[in-house]
Amino acid sequence: MQNLNSKILAIDFGTKIIGTAINDINLNLCLPYCEITNNELKFKKILEIVEEENIKEIVIGFPKTQNSYVSERHQLIIDFKNQLSELLKNKNIEICFFDESYSTKSSKESLMNFNVKTSKLKKNKDMIAASIILENYLASKK
């Protein structure tokens, strides 16, 4: 585990959209960052974020299961992590999974509590989910 005073990128992996969030080490906040279309350019965009934001650790949301069953969605996330690890192998960046159970549902509920319109809710839910994953990850390290 990296120092909690270093920048961390959280990823909420989706088959269409990848939500991201980063921590602000000065304000001790987790902030939605951007959404990335899950296509052949996704790794290029993630590498840009890593460089621009001086990321030292990446946390990828991974749905917890009651048993050891690996679904197709689990395998997609595992493959994504493996590809990302290969691309970043010379950068000394730790990549780990963290339970993302209910993060997307929680993001929708949070936005609804602030009376966010349905169209904006759909647009921002993946970034908010990544923020929730990052908040929970950081809380687990304290």
Curated annotation (Swiss-Prot):
It is found in: Cytoplasm. It comes from Malacoplasma penetrans (strain HF-2) (Mycoplasma penetrans). The keyword Mitochondrion does not apply. One of its GO terms (cellular component) is cytosol. Its EC number is 3.1.-.-. CDD domains: YqgF. It is an enzyme of class 3 (hydrolase). Could be a nuclease involved in processing of the 5'-end of pre-16S rRNA. One of its GO terms (molecular function) is nuclease activity. InterPro entries: RNaseH-like_sf (IPR012337), YqgF (IPR005227), YqgF/RNaseH-like_dom (IPR006641), YqgF/RNaseH-like_dom_sf (IPR037027). Keywords: Cytoplasm, Hydrolase, Nuclease, Ribosome biogenesis. This is Putative pre-16S rRNA nuclease. Belongs to the YqgF nuclease family. One of its GO terms (biological process) is rRNA 5'-end processing. Its main location: cytoplasm. The keyword Cytoplasm applies.
